[in-house]
Amino acid sequence: MELYLDTANVAEVERLAHIFPIAGVTTNPSIIAASKESIWEVLPRLQKAIGDEGILFAQTMSRDAQGMVEEAKRLRDAIPGIVVKIPVTSEGLAAIKILKKEGITTLGTAVYSAAQGLLAALAGAKYVAPYVNRVDAQGGDGIRTVQELQALLEMHAPESMVLAASFKTPRQALDCLLAGCESITLPLDVAQQMLNTPAVESAIEKFEHDWNAAFGTTHL
């Protein structure tokens, strides 16, 4: 199972990389834009924050296949080993096929259906990213989409894997993992919610109170 952070906040990645067992960082154009930094400046800093073994994802902006391929090569040249996110449109599928031949690893993004995700995998995407909460927001069932996509990949494209995205709650993320999802990417607030449970702090304070009452210290 692989856990990613969905952010371009370098300081938070540096902090959380010491806490969470993260495999890397995912970004998208909106996340990069919110950082107010050039993508060519922030990507190297993110890679440094996650280390050489961490996997970094960044997305193309062009709408046509040739433009996507050219931008993917620029990203690869800037960050060797980067995974390039390609929207799963007709042009995107064409780009994924070309990039597969070029040896550039891709993720099929903006996936709203299992069929769409399967096409990305068959075209050559190593990762496929269904948008869990956004599917829910459109009246669909995000977790069901993940389940169906996971089953399809296991049967027809076992070299590809689901990297579920677009979460608003830890429960959504856990349900994806229970559905057999191999990897997820979490926004910072959801990652923090997984750890910051008020009951935990109350339990620790009770332990300290009882220990201090008996031994006059809060240390061993």
Swiss-Prot record:
Its main location: cytoplasm. PROSITE patterns: TRANSALDOLASE_1, TRANSALDOLASE_2. Its EC number is 4.1.2.-. Pathway: Carbohydrate metabolism; fructose metabolism. GO terms for cellular component: cytoplasm. GO terms for biological process: fructose metabolic process. Homodecamer. This is Fructose-6-phosphate aldolase 2. The lineage of its organism: Bacteria, Pseudomonadati, Pseudomonadota, Gammaproteobacteria, Enterobacterales.
